[in-house]
């Protein structure tokens, strides 16, 4: 699976477990550490684990194995490293403390929204909406 597709799939899996403020950071022009970060927030340590487990299971079903993971002990910030794409699942207070979006502020940022939170007209048409850092809306079918 190509990195951009993998990042979008991870974002969808996060949203399926009610993660919110899901963003994809495009790091290709900034670092060689990873092509994309996918970052989300959760409301509890139980939800942190549920989101991480769902991402791992969903990626396993797509024959994408996690290369390294960290954070299952504290359940405040779990990192799932898929080499080209790194998923960051945060408890909401920890996300604001570490503020990866600011740290990687030069990266192109795409906000991924849940279709249930979209305006009714777009949701009826079966479209998902993403928003880039330039506040430009992109609709996909």
Protein language model features and the residues they cover:
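Glycine/charge-rich, flexible interdomain linkers and switch-proximal surface loops
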Residues: 22-33, 65-84
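Compact, glycine-rich, soluble single-domain proteins
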Residues: 47-61, 79
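RNA pseudouridine synthases
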Residues: 78, 88-90, 95-108, 120
